[in-house]
Swiss-Prot record:
Entry similarity comment: Belongs to the type II cytokine receptor family.
Single GO molecular function: JAK pathway signal transduction adaptor activity
Region (Disordered): 318-418, 455-515
Protein name: Interferon alpha/beta receptor 2
Outcome reported for the amino acid change (mutating Y318F): Does not inhibit STAT1, STAT2 and STAT3 activation by IFN. Inhibits STAT1, STAT2 and STAT3 activation by IFN. Inhibits STAT1, STAT2 and STAT3 activation by IFN. Does not inhibit STAT1, STAT2 and STAT3 activation by IFN
Role this protein plays: Together with IFNAR1, forms the heterodimeric receptor for type I interferons (including interferons alpha, beta, epsilon, omega and kappa). Type I interferon binding activates the JAK-STAT signaling cascade, resulting in transcriptional activation or repression of interferon-regulated genes that encode the effectors of the interferon response. Mechanistically, type I interferon-binding brings the IFNAR1 and IFNAR2 subunits into close proximity with one another, driving their associated Janus kinases (JAKs) (TYK2 bound to IFNAR1 and JAK1 bound to IFNAR2) to cross-phosphorylate one another.
Effect on the protein of changing P362S: No effect on activation of STAT1 upon IFNA2 or IFNG binding
Effect annotated for changing P295L: No effect on activation of STAT1 upon IFNA2 or IFNG binding
Compositionally biased tracts (Acidic residues): 362-375
Residues in the Cytoplasmic compartment per record: 265-515
Subunit and interaction comment: Heterodimer with IFNAR1; forming the receptor for type I interferon. Interacts with JAK1. Interacts with the transcriptional factors STAT1 and STAT2. Interacts with USP18; indirectly via STAT2, it negatively regulates the assembly of the ternary interferon-IFNAR1-IFNAR2 complex and therefore type I interferon signaling.
Organism: Homo sapiens
C-alpha cells in the first residue's frame, strides 16, 4: 500500500494555511453560537471508505433527522450540504466521494432537527492524515488439514490518496501462541486478497485477526477473531498402517537374525568353547581405552652408610711354641694361587687346637674391627679322650666316627676367633712343592717338619708307625718321611672330596681332614 508522495509535504503546509485563513478571513457565512459543543465526531477509514460518525453528549435530546455541511478551509467558500447526508436518520455519513484529498483541512457542521425545529448545531475541523483512524477490513477464513486460507475484501476502486502509508497485518493465535504475518501487496489495495497460513497442525483450533497498521504507530483497531478447527489429516490412517507395517518388518528381521545366530552356535561355527589364553581374553575390551592407573608404589627413605674395613691376613702358623709377634704374610705364586705354609702337628696338638677354637668367645667374630688380644689357650693333656679315641683301631673309628667340633656354617668362613682359622682343604687341588733355601730364609717362622714329631704307634703292631706329616696330591693322600728340607703347602680355597681315602689322616667322619 502506497502513500501519496505529496501527503507529507502538504500536511504541514495546510496546517499553517488553515490557521492563517481562520485568523484573517474568518468564516463568510452566518452561523449560530457554537461555543457550547454538544457533539462528538469521529472520522475513520472503514474498508477504505471515509466514514464520519457522531454522537450526542446530551442523550435527552433526540433529533428526528440530521443534516451535514462542510467546506474546505483553504478555499473561501460557503458551506455545502452533503447530498447523501441531508435529512438523514443515520448517525454516520460516507464522505469518500466528497473528501478526496488527504492533505486538506475540512470544516464540518452538523445540525439536528426535530420536525422543522433545530435542536442543536455543532462543528468540528478535520485533518484526514492525523484524525483518521483505520478500521480493519472485512475478511473470511477457510480451514484445511494443515493450512488456512485468509481472504481479505477490499473495495474494487480505492483512491491512492486514501491508502496512506498502511500495511496489512494477519495475526494467528493458537493455544496462547500469537504469530504475525505481514503479506506484501503489490499495487493498490483493490479487490479481494488471499493469503495462506501454512505449516499448521491438523485437528487443532486456530483463530485469525486482520487489521491495518500505520507507520506512525497509531493505535490500531483489530478485527474480531475468527476461529476454525482444522480437520484431522486424511493420511493419518495410512500413516498408522505404515507404522504398523514397519514394526512388523523390524520384528521379522530381528527374528531371522536371532534364529540364524542360534543355528550357527548350535552347529559350532561360532561361539566355540575353547579356552583361549589370557592374552586373547576380550571380556574387558571396553575397559581397554580407559585403563586403570597402576597402584602407587610404597616409597621408603633409605640411608646408605659406607664402612671401609681392611681385610685381615691371618697367621696360619699353629706352632704354640712360637711367641714372636711377627706374622708371616701369605705369598702369591705366579699362577694366581695364594700360598700358605702349614705345619702338621701331632694328634694331641691338633685336638687341642680344635678344642681351643670352641672355647673362644663368639663375640670376637662379630667384632672384627676391635683390637685383637692374644689369649693363651690351655694345652690338651697327652692322654685326652680325643687321643684315646683316635688311637683306637680302624674298625672302632668306623663304628663311632668323631663329630665335627665346628658347625657346617663355619666351613665357608675364612676368619676364626682369636687370630686362628679353620678351613677345609680339597686334596685334589692341593699343590706341594719343596721350599728352597731362599724361601726358607725369607719366612720368619720356618715351616719345616720337626724331627721330634710324635709318632702314632699301634700297641698291637709296634712296627707300624704313622707319621703325622701328610702330603696331599691330586690322586689322594700318602704318608711321607720326615725330611728337614720338605714342607707341605695347601690351598685354602677348595673343599675336600677324597680325604677319607687315607687312614693315616685324622678322620672327622664327614670326609674332611682336621688341620
Amino acid at each position: 500500500m502506497l502513500l501519496s508522495q505529496n501527503a507529507f509535504i502538504f500536511r504541514s503546509l495546510n496546517l499553517v494555511l488553515m490557521v492563517y485563513i481562520s485568523l484573517v478571513f474568518g468564516i463568510s457565512y452566518d452561523s449560530p453560537d457554537y461555543t457550547d459543543e454538544s457533539c462528538t465526531f469521529k472520522i475513520s477509514l472503514r474498508n477504505f471508505r471515509s466514514i464520519l460518525s457522531w454522537e450526542l453528549k446530551n442523550h435527552s435530546i433526540v433529533p428526528t433527522h440530521y443534516t451535514l455541511l462542510y467546506t474546505i478551509m483553504s478555499k473561501p467558500e460557503d458551506l455545502k450540504v452533503v447530498k447523501n447526508c441531508a435529512n438523514t436518520t443515520r448517525s454516520f455519513c460516507d464522505l469518500t466521494d466528497e473528501w478526496r484529498s488527504t492533505h486538506e483541512a475540512y470544516v464540518t457542521v452538523l445540525e439536528g432537527f426535530s420536525g422543522n425545529t433545530t435542536l442543536f448545531s455543532c462543528s468540528h475541523n478535520f485533518w484526514l492524515a492525523i484524525d483518521m483512524s483505520f478500521e480493519p477490513p472485512e475478511f473470511e477464513i477457510v480451514g484445511f488439514t494443515n493450512h488456512i486460507n485468509v481472504m481479505v475484501k477490499f473495495p474494487s476502486i480505492v483512491e491512492e490518496e486514501l491508502q496512506f502509508d498502511l500495511s496489512l497485518v494477519i495475526e494467528e493465535q493458537s493455544e496462547g501462541i500469537v504469530k504475525k504475518h505481514k503479506p506484501e501487496i503489490k499495487g493498490n489495495m483493490s479487490g479481494n486478497f488471499t493469503y495462506i497460513i501454512d505449516k499448521l497442525i491438523p485437528n487443532t483450533n486456530y483463530c485469525v485477526s486482520v487489521y491495518l497498521e500505520h507507520s506512525d504507530e497509531q493505535a490500531v483497531i483489530k478485527s474480531p477473531l475468527k476461529c476454525t478447527l482444522l480437520p484431522p489429516g486424511q493420511e493419518s490412517e495410512s500413516a498408522e498402517s505404515a507404522k504398523i507395517g514397519g514394526i512388523i518388518t523390524v520384528f521379522l528381521i530381528a527374528l531371522v537374525l536371532t534364529s540364524t545366530i542360534v543355528t550357527l552356535k548350535w552347529i559350532g561355527y561360532i561361539c566355540l568353547r575353547n579356552s583361549l589364553p589370557k592374552v586373547l581374553n576380550f571380556h574387558n575390551f571396553l575397559a581397554w581405552p580407559f585403563p586403570n592407573l597402576p597402584p602407587l608404589e610404597a616409597m621408603d627413605m633409605v640411608e646408605v652408610i659406607y664402612i671401609n674395613r681392611k681385610k685381615k691376613v691371618w697367621d696360619y702358623n699353629y706352632d704354640d711354641e712360637s711367641d714372636s709377634d711377627t706374622e708371616a704374610a701369605p705369598r702369591t705364586s705366579g699362577g694366581g694361587y695364594t700360598m700358605h705354609g702349614l705345619t702338621v702337628r701331632p694328634l694331641g696338638q691338633a685336638s687341642a687346637t680344635s678344642t681351643e677354637s670352641q672355647l673362644i668367645d663368639p663375640e670376637s667374630e662379630e667384632e672384627p674391627d676391635l683390637p685383637e688380644v692374644d689369649v693363651e689357650l690351655p694345652t690338651m693333656p697327652k692322654d685326652s679322650p680325643q687321643q684315646l679315641e683316635l688311637l683306637s683301631g680302624p674298625c672302632e673309628r668306623r663304628k663311632s666316627p668323631l663329630q665335627d667340633p665346628f658347625p657346617e656354617e663355619d666351613y665357608s668362613s675364612t676368619e676364626g676367633s682369636g687370630g686362628r682359622i679353620t678351613f677345609n682343604v680339597d686334596l685334589n687341588s692341593v699343590f706341594l712343592r719343596v721350599l728352597d733355601d731362599e724361601d726358607s730364609d725369607d719366612l720368619e717362622a720356618p715351616l719345616m717338619l720337626s724331627s721330634h714329631l710324635e709318632e702314632m704307634v699301634d700297641p698291637e703292631d709296634p712296627d707300624n708307625v704313622q707319621s703325622n706329616h701328610l702330603l696331599a696330591s691330586g690322586e689322594g693322600t700318602q704318608p711321607t718321611f720326615p725330611s728337614p728340607s720338605s714342607e707341605g703347602l695347601w690351598s685354602e680355597d677348595a673343599p675336600s672330596d677324597q680325604s677319607d681315602t687315607s687312614e693315616s689322616d685324622v678322620d672327622l667322619g664327614d670326609g674332611y681332614i682336621m688341620r
